[in-house]
Regions:
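N-terminal leader segment of winged-helix/HTH proteins
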Residues: 1-36
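Conserved Class I S-adenosyl-L-methionine-dependent methyltransferase catalytic core
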Residues: 27-33, 37-43, 48-49, 73, ...
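Core SAM-dependent methyltransferase catalytic element
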Residues: 341-362
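A short acidic, leucine-rich amphipathic alpha-helix
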Residues: 58-64
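C-terminal alpha-helical "lid/dimerization" subdomain adjacent to the S-adenosyl-L-methionine
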Residues: 284-339
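A short glycine-rich, Lys/Arg-flanked "PGG" loop and its adjoining helix->strand segment in the class I
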Residues: 265-277
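Conserved adenosyl
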Residues: 124-259, 264-266, 284
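Short helix-to-turn junction characteristic of helix-turn-helix DNA-binding domains
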Residues: 50-54, 200
Length: 362
């Protein structure tokens, strides 16, 4: 039975303030509709067809993408109204190059197609999320479909394809030299294995293993490694890092994993035990403020939304800490590291909008 609230006098709102906020809220609804249309365009290859073939009428785009012309026209008009595509007087629609970099060109640093796919895979679980609000608990990883996980991998791929090797590891030249010579690396919470595969391609003398608690993700990673041709120095296993990590390693990494963990303290302690005495733990976490009240603006809104839809709820589904996407700022990282026995917790200056990167040493 819910708490009975004491009646109180409702304040009469300022009319101008109501109108201003209503405009803002309606703008968010419009953005949601644009996101839905983008998710459809990403799934059906409409953006790539428009980008690759150039300006097109609805009939031409429908032929390129093998979709119904009437649906193509409504989609084009909808995204033209949002300013995502441009419409010419002759009835053709175009995707400007700057927009194509975000919407059509897979693998680019600014590409957002994976985010649209991930969100489309999570929204069908809103009913279960409401039940968790009412009764506690959460949504387990097994409840999410391929769109959620494939989208997640696509959204974060730029971090590993561009930043990990090109910007982040160069901040640790001694570690790069060690990897060149041959070292052992375990990535805990490896997901679809993108980071491990890129590392194996760059450092053929080193060996890499990816661990994930979710068997379906491990299978995705194995398929990706086979396709990349790095199976001779990469393996993936189903392991919950909080319950212990097999073997010892020169490097252990977690890439935006600790805030998802049911037991973050046990996870970081398990990583400490799995490190050689001269080893390095590389910890990537979301770029959030130390004070939760300072997490404001569009980026924080996206973080909290994904936290409700996945990060926090999957932890709570296992009776976990439920830190959430913004629950692992620098003070929490330092506290977890020190409690696990790390003598040095150093934040590296990666200057990244989404992430903060830490080096932990014994």
């Amino acid at each position: 039975m819910g708490t009975v609230l004491e009646p109180h006098e409702l304040q009469e709102p300022d009319g101008a303030a109501v109108e201003a906020f209503a405009g803002r809220a309606f703008g968010d609804v419009a953005g949601t509709m644009a996101t839905v249309m983008c998710a459809v365009g990403d799934k059906l290859g409409l953006f790539t067809a428009l980008d690759a073939g150039g300006p097109a009428t609805a009939a031409e785009l429908a032929a390129r993408a093998d979709v119904d012309e009437r649906y193509a026209l409504e989609w084009l008009r909808g995204l033209a109204s949002a300013g995502y595509v441009e419409q010419a007087p002759d009835g053709r629609f175009a995707l400007p190059p700057a927009h194509a970099a975000v919407l059509a060109r897979e693998g680019g640093v600014m590409f957002l197609g994976g985010g649209y796919q991930e969100l489309a895979g999570m929204l069908p679980l809103l009913g279960r999320l409401g039940e968790a609000f009412r009764h506690g608990g959460g949504i387990p990883q097994s409840a999410y479909d391929d769109d959620a996980y494939d989208g997640m991998a696509r959204l974060t791929s730029a971090w590993f394809d561009h930043h990990l090797l090109g910007r982040w590891l160069p901040l640790l030249p001694d570690l790069e030299a060690r990897l060149d010579a041959g070292a052992s690396w375990a990535d805990v919470g490896c997901g679809a294995g993108r980071a491990v595969i890129r590392l194996a391609e760059a450092y053929p003398r080193s060996t890499f293993v990816g661990y994930d608690a979710f068997p379906e993700q491990v299978e995705r990673a194995r398929r990706a490694a086979a396709a990349a041709g790095v199976g001779d120095r990469v393996r993936f296993e189903t392991v919950d890092g909080a319950h212990g990590i097999p073997g010892t390693y020169d490097v252990v990494s977690t890439f935006d994993v600790v805030h998802d963990a049911a037991d973050p303290g046990a996870l970081v302690a398990g990583i400490r035990r799995a490190l050689n005495d001269d080893g390095t733990y590389l910890l990537l976490e979301m770029n959030c403020a130390d004070d939760p009240s300072a997490n404001v603006g569009p980026l924080a809104t996206v973080f909290y939304g994904f936290s409700l839809l996945y990060c926090m709820t999957t932890s709570l589904a296992h009776g976990g800490a439920g830190l959430g996407t913004c629950g692992c700022p620098a003070p929490v990282v330092r506290r977890l590291g020190e409690a696990a026995g790390f003598g040095s917790v150093r934040e590296l200056p990666i200057d990244d909008v989404f992430n903060r990167f830490y080096e932990l040493r014994v």
